[in-house]
């Protein structure tokens, strides 16, 4: 037992294993702050169009408006639209809420690091990013097995010297393999910063945001 404990301590020392503590000194909070988390209380609403390249021809889009203070979400596609409350009981939530959470993570994941509590993280310095090979700090986020629509998922974030995300790898269920994508075209929208484009290893833009409005 003593040897096992020592081994675990060494592993945690090497990889900076940390419980979730979103205080200003933790790396997850530093990432959130780099995108303007300290000013997020100035935001009343965020509207945007999610675009994903399904194949060489077809693009799927859906429009969202998140009324942050009112805790309501407006959803629209080419053939439907409606508004729902985030305060609804979990078993009454519309299916599109899964899409809202998915799209919001692609757009606002830095802020989720401050909002979410059900994860653990570890850090590793001087790691090349999987696509560009840029030297970075690797921050791995692993969610618990109980919360959310896809519990147990993991995200490897590759950060620059300013704690901005260069690339990430999403690993479903904390599996060993994932698909690396970029975080590009960071723009200022009101008090916060958002990455508006994600490209794959081939350099092809496959997820992007348009019609962004932050009020």
What label would you give each PLM region?
Residues 20-24, 84-153, 174:
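Flexible, processing/modification-adjacent segments and terminal tails
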Residues 1-4:
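Positively charged n-region of N-terminal signal peptides that target proteins for export
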Residues 135-215:
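Gly/Pro-enriched, hydrophobic low-complexity segments
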Residues 13-16:
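C-terminal motif of bacterial Sec signal peptides marking the signal peptidase cleavage site
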Residues 22, 46-47, 52, 58, ...:
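N- and C-terminal low-complexity/disordered segments
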Residues 6-9:
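Sec-dependent N-terminal signal peptides
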Residues 23-28, 34, 38, 117-126, ...:
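Intrinsically disordered terminal and processing segments
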Residues 24-94, 125-126:
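N-terminal mature ectodomain segment of secretory-pathway/periplasmic proteins
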């Amino acid at each position: 037992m003593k040897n096992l404990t020592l081994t675990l301590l060494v592993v945690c020392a090497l990889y900076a294993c940390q419980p979730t503590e979103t205080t200003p000194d933790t790396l997850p909070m530093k990432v959130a702050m780099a995108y303007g988390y300290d000013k997020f209380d100035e935001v009343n609403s965020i509207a945007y169009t999610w675009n994903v390249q399904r194949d060489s021809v077809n693009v799927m889009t859906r429009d969202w408006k998140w009324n942050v203070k009112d805790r309501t979400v407006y959803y629209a596609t080419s053939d439907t639209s409606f508004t729902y409350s985030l305060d609804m009981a979990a078993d009454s939530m519309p299916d599109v809420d899964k899409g809202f959470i998915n799209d919001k993570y692609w757009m606002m994941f830095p802020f989720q690091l401050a909002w979410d509590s059900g994860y653990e993280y570890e850090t590793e310095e001087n790691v090349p990013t999987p696509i560009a090979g840029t030297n970075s700090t690797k921050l791995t986020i692993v969610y618990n097995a109980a919360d959310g629509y896809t519990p147990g998922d993991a995200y490897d974030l590759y950060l620059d010297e300013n704690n901005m995300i260069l690339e990430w790898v999403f690993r479903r269920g904390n599996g060993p393999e994932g698909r690396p994508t970029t975080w590009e075209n960071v723009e200022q929208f009101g008090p916060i910063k958002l990455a508006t484009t994600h490209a794959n290893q081939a350099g092809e833009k496959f997820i992007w945001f348009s019609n962004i409005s932050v009020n």
